[in-house]
């Protein structure tokens, strides 16, 4: 490996998803702004907080909600059903 190709701040960083209460340690250059956390091995590591990860994202966990299961045509029919019925009565 070539010397001096990695940035100076390339180190082991703890990525922690607080919503899933899970963390991962990997080598990274991510800016942690001085935040640290003690990991399960008893050592203190720079901490990068995550809002969402594969442990908490609905697509990965399978806990997603089906907001809309109807198609466009049925939505259109529901929206304009009253207009269409009054139009048919006028004839």
Curated annotation (Swiss-Prot):
Keywords noted in UniProt: Ribonucleoprotein, Ribosomal protein
Molecular function in Gene Ontology: structural constituent of ribosome
GO cellular component, one term: ribosome
Pfam families in alphabetical order: Ribosomal_L31
Any one GO biological process: translation
Top-rank taxon: Bacteria
PROSITE patterns reported in the protein's UniProt record: RIBOSOMAL_L31
Keyword Transmembrane helix: no
Keyword Zinc: no
Family: Belongs to the bacterial ribosomal protein bL31 family. Type B subfamily.
Quaternary organization: Part of the 50S ribosomal subunit.
Designated name of the protein: Large ribosomal subunit protein bL31B
Species: Neisseria meningitidis serogroup C (strain 053442)
């Amino acid at each position: 490996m070539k010397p001096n190709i990695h940035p100076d701040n390339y180190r082991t960083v703890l990525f922690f998803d607080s919503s899933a209460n899970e963390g991962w340690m990997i080598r990274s250059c991510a800016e942690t702004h001085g935040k640290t956390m003690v990991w399960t091995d008893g050592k203190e590591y720079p901490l990068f907080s995550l809002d969402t990860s594969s442990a908490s994202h609905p697509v990965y966990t399978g806990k997603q909600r089906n907001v809309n299961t109807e198609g466009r045509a049925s939505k259109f029919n529901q929206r304009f059903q009253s207009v269409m019925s009054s139009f048919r009565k006028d004839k």
